[in-house]
């Protein structure tokens, strides 16, 4: 559907911007409350759209705890972004001029949907360079961000990190 977008790379952002410029949507649903989904929600709001974020967990940004996420929730709501937590999207149907987004606990109508869920790190270049990646595709680094190649350091969204509190690996 031309009103439903994924968000994984720069060309995806161009398609979203072109749709907004050419169709003047009034509302959007962002599916997924990770870093990318939240950033997109803020940008859509800044562009003048009514924005709803739907997140399956009880808080946005899975890598932070619930208490810290509360500040993010307050910031988003203060800026007019609606949050629907602990609910997921079951279906998206095009009813002509609007999209109907069916949730587990209700329905929403909007002009466009951004899918920002299940994003895998873009580590193709790292793999081609022979760097070690974990089972989820994130670039493995040590506590100094050094990769498996002693001459290459890595930072950014595609890098495995160690949670300073729990010691668990993530990205």
Question: Residues of each region from the PLM?
Answer:
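Rossmann-like NAD(P)H-binding beta-loop-alpha module
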Residues: 12-64, 81
């Amino acid at each position: 559907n031309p009103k439903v977008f994924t968000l994984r790379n720069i060309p995806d952002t161009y398609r979203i911007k072109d749709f907004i410029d050419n169709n003047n949507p009034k509302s959007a649903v962002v599916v997924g409350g990770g870093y990318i989904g939240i950033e997109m929600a803020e940008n859509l709001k800044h562009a003048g759209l009514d924005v709803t974020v739907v997140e399956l967990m009880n808080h946005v940004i899975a890598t932070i705890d619930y208490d810290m996420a509360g500040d993010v929730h307050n910031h988003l709501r203060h800026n007019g972004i609606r949050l629907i937590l602990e609910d997921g999207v079951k279906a998206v149907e095009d009813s002509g001029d609007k999209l109907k987004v069916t949730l587990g606990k209700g329905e929403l109508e909007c002009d466009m949907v951004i899918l920002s869920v299940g994003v895998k790190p873009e580590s193709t270049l790292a793999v081609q360079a022979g760097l070690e990646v974990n089972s989820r595709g994130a670039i493995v680094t040590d506590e100094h961000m050094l990769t498996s190649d002693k001459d290459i350091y890595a930072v950014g969204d595609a890098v495995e990190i160690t949670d300073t509190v729990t010691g668990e690996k993530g990205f």
